[in-house]
Amino acid sequence: MKLTPREQEKLLIVVAADLARRRKERGLKLNYPEAVALITYELLEGARDGRTVAELMQYGATILTRDDVMEGVADMIDEIQVEATFPDGTKLVTVHQPIRS
């Protein structure tokens, strides 16, 4: 199977987000890459589901809480930017302070 670099990156996000979700369900706190992967995946899927950029910017800050991540991780993530595919094209979604509470 031949994948473009963009397709490889998306596949890596899916795998990392799946691992993060499983660890979170087991009660483990997520590290930096796991937290970023899970938020990124949810934003990408939200775009595919037809949500707007504004909706995703708000939703992105509700996916994880400080209790879901290891100490210091929330402070390390100032923003997450995702180039997502919407029904009307590709757009940049930026979530500032994605882990707020």
UniProtKB/Swiss-Prot annotation:
Tagged with keyword Cytoplasm: yes
GO cellular component labels: cytoplasm
A Pfam family of this chain: Urease_gamma
Molecular functions per Gene Ontology: nickel cation binding; urease activity
Top EC category: hydrolase
Recorded catalytic activity of this chain's protein: urea + 2 H2O + H(+) = hydrogencarbonate + 2 NH4(+)
Pathway: Nitrogen metabolism; urea degradation; CO(2) and NH(3) from urea (urease route): step 1/1
Source superkingdom: Bacteria
Keywords for this protein: Cytoplasm, Hydrolase
InterPro entries with a match to the protein in the record: Urease_gamma (IPR012010), Urease_gamma/gamma-beta_su (IPR002026), Urease_gamma_sf (IPR036463), Urease_subunit (IPR050069)
Subcellular location, record wording: Cytoplasm
Annotated disulfide bonds: none
Gene Ontology terms: biological process: urea catabolic process
EC number assigned by the record: 3.5.1.5
Statement: the UniProt record of this protein carries the keyword Metal-binding: no
SUPFAM superfamilies registered for this protein in UniProt: Urease, gamma-subunit
Similarity comment: Belongs to the urease gamma subunit family.
Family matches, as NCBIfam families: PRK13241.1 (NF009712), urease_gam (TIGR00193)
Subunit (UniProt): Heterotrimer of UreA (gamma), UreB (beta) and UreC (alpha) subunits. Three heterotrimers associate to form the active enzyme.
Stated name of the protein: Urease subunit gamma
Source organism of the structure: Geobacillus kaustophilus (strain HTA426)
Gene: ureA
